[in-house]
Amino acid sequence: MIALALLSALLSASDAAQPQTCEPDRALSYICGMDKPEDIIQIPGTRWLIASGFAPGSGLKLVDTRQRSARSWYPPNAGASSPRPFPKCAEAPSAALFNAHGISLRKIGSHRYRLYVVNHGGRESIELFEFSVDSSAAAPVLEWQGCLPLPAGLAGNAVASFADGTVLTTVLTRPGTSIADFMRGQATGGVYQWRPGERSFTLLPGTELPGDNGIETSPDQRHFYVVAFGWHSVVEFDRWTTSKPTRRFIAPGFMPDNIRWFRDGLIAAGMRLYEPTCGGYRKTVNGVADPMLCHRGYSVARLDLDRGIMRVIATGTPEEHFNGVSSAAIIGNTLWLGSYQSDRLAYRPIAPR
């Protein structure tokens, strides 16, 4: 994920360079028309993959991984429940503005899910939706449930939740800090928490890291995990005592972005740390961080929390039509890759896991 301070420049530069073809590259095939699918997540046990759209009006897409097709999943069903369980906002974001960044799912019933979406369109907020899935071939119908506004001056990045309704969101750069700062190892971000009954998000002391990025909670509800982008690491916190991290896992040769629980561990995806065709490591010039528009290779790694090892399970070299790998999902023998820069979702074979 990237800071909003670079967003407009990056979007205009990226849009201008986007190719028109949707033919496969050397190692990747594509579903096009996605408009920066920064974060992706599978609806468990189904063929459906949810993709965010990190651009104004891009919103959400629902991907049929069997048919290799995608459809717009926004605006939501107009007949959703009322009164809404999260009444802070009077109406859902405008479809023309909805800018979906990080996303997260939580099962709240036998066939019922809640979807959390970091939004930058029209307001800085966590938008909440619900939907049901069944055994039929029908696509699930999205229902808006309200929103949780972020404190003034803050832009969310990733989002996660606990089973008791607690919501966590990361902020990459707080006011007065920059991407160049976290590239130097300085603390720039934080994890903010909202609990049912509270009025607003508050900072969890001790979670201020160099570029707080992707976030995930543990199934046992005891820990959460945060990507420190400036450290190229995944950091573990005890949920109840956040004054300092409990563990830190350094990514092998890449810059993890989003993380997601996968079976008994985490998977992380991101661009390669050292890319010869881009002049090596990411740099700052005159205090400004390289926006990484030069196409870099990528890595996907599995973090074994029991053994404390992060091992690369897939990697790729730069591709002509795809850059900015930011998230991954494994469905069967297929690896899906999201991007904060590209106009498409990528997929490729992967050995069974």
Please identify what each model-predicted range represents.
Residues 60-66, 123-135, 184-196, 290-306:
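Beta-propeller blade signature
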Residues 48-50, 114-116, 166-168, 223-226, ...:
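Conserved beta-propeller blade signature
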Residues 253-318:
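Loop/turn-rich, solvent-exposed surfaces of beta-rich toroidal or solenoidal domains
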Residues 63-70, 129-140, 237-242, 305-307, ...:
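Short loop/turn segments immediately following beta-strands, especially the blade-tip
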Residues 19-20, 49-81, 134-137:
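Beta-propeller domains
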Residues 51-57, 117-118, 169-188, 269-295, ...:
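Short, conserved, GDST-rich strand-edge loop motifs in beta-rich repeat architectures
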Residues 324-353:
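Blade-level signature of beta-propeller repeat domains, shared across WD40, Kelch, NHL, RCC1
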Residues 33-45, 79-107, 141-144, 149-167, ...:
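Beta-rich, blade/repeat-based domains predominating
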